[in-house]
Amino acid sequence: MKPILPDYNNAGVLIIGDVMLDRYWYGPTSRISPEAPVPVVKVENNEERPGGAANVAMNIASLGGHARIVGLTGMDEPAKVLTETLNSLKVKCDFVALPEYPTITKLRVMSRGQQLIRLDFEDKFEGTDPELVLTRMERALPHVQAVILSDYAKGALEHVEALIAKARAANVPVFIDPKGTNFEPYRGATLLTPNMSEFEAVVGKVTSDDDLVEKALGLIEKFELGALLVTRSEHGMTLVRPDQKPFHLPTQAKEVYDVTGAGDTVISVLAASVAAGKPLDEACALANAAAGVVVGKLGTSTLSTIELAEAIHGSRDTDFGVIAEAALIDAVKAAQAKGEKVVMTNGCFDILHAGHVSYLNNAAKLGDRLIVAVNTDESVKRLKGPGRPVNPTDRRMAVLAGLGAVDWVVPFSEDTPQRLISEVLPDLLVKGGDYKPEDIAGGKEVIAAGGEVKVLNFEDGCSTTEIIDAIKGGRG
């Protein structure tokens, strides 16, 4: 499966869970301490990153989604750092500040790419009033299409059953990264994402893929779950749902430097993709690709839609296919950053014929990437009149995406693609027919940005209208 990136700008996700601050101290190590047999690190720089549930929120924001987060913090300097950092990324924070507790903070000392020690500053949040979190959840639910409960067993999800019930009552799917060996509190969740160690701690040793599926189905039935996604390290991940075939996904990681936060990335991409309208199997494929990216980074990491697109589609010779506008803009920027020339054209392409294919092949030869923008059904009807289009938008785009000359296919609903072109800003805008370059929609914007506009001739004797008339007349 090669999934297509959704438009994450349409995804609203609420994250509730254990928030923490990850601190990193970096420096070289050149000697052993005379006080004890430990290395001496000369700290030269430091870094602070949101961790735990806050890293989940940061992942969603980095994809372009709308993240809201609820969690428990102290009233201290780490809480301030967390809030300011997340706000700068456009994450809406609604933390419960409890002065009697410290904000959970983890300090890692790093040298030469290796973690030497981790120091944890925390007290488990216990006995907090559940209404503090529930009321914040109620405020957020009307604005989201998915809920993530990120459980690190630090106390924020002490009343997880009530959170699941409230989300289900609002008909919002609940995705949970579980903790511990007791899954009873997660009863009724839409999906759990245990890693293999967490899964085996609950069901016992797994001996084969079939055994994993059988045990996963047992958990699904026992705890009334919608599905289980078991992340399996070098073996990828497996999605198990009742009454459906298991969906095995091989790992996409080329190199593994650090698994810190990989589970956060999986659940964030998964939930954001579902919130943006993707079916669960495609969302899992996207999450698997995302995990392959972040384990190749050091420390708690996020990824962009550009990195995710490249992980999915691989080399420049691989067609991207149908793509959402926001993802296309990111993909074009990535292509241009690598020195690739991006060509763009547009049309209705109602009944694809030899003239279209010849035109698109010629357009593709003018650069490294070809974008085809396609009028939606409503747009075609306004331009061509009643009875058009013959083929709906999704079919027209699917046919175009299957052509070797075409890299991306994107729909637009306006009468002209001027707005879309001004957002994408290709290096070369191409149009077929007898237009003057200055009259082509979007041409002025492309030229102003340093690009070019070119007119190509259509092949004589090929016309969609003629084909339709011939069919109506009973010929051919």
From Swiss-Prot:
One GO BP: ADP-L-glycero-beta-D-manno-heptose biosynthetic process
Chain positions recorded as ATP binding sites: 195-198
Chain residue ranges for the region called Ribokinase: 1-318
Reactions performed catalytically: D-glycero-beta-D-manno-heptose 7-phosphate + ATP = D-glycero-beta-D-manno-heptose 1,7-bisphosphate + ADP + H(+); D-glycero-beta-D-manno-heptose 1-phosphate + ATP + H(+) = ADP-D-glycero-beta-D-manno-heptose + diphosphate
Keywords (A to Z) from UniProt: ATP-binding, Carbohydrate metabolism, Kinase, Lipopolysaccharide biosynthesis, Multifunctional enzyme, Nucleotide-binding, Nucleotidyltransferase, Transferase
Subunit composition and interactions: Homodimer.
Name of this chain's protein: Bifunctional protein HldE
Taxonomic source organism: Vibrio vulnificus (strain CMCP6)
Gene from which the chain derives: hldE
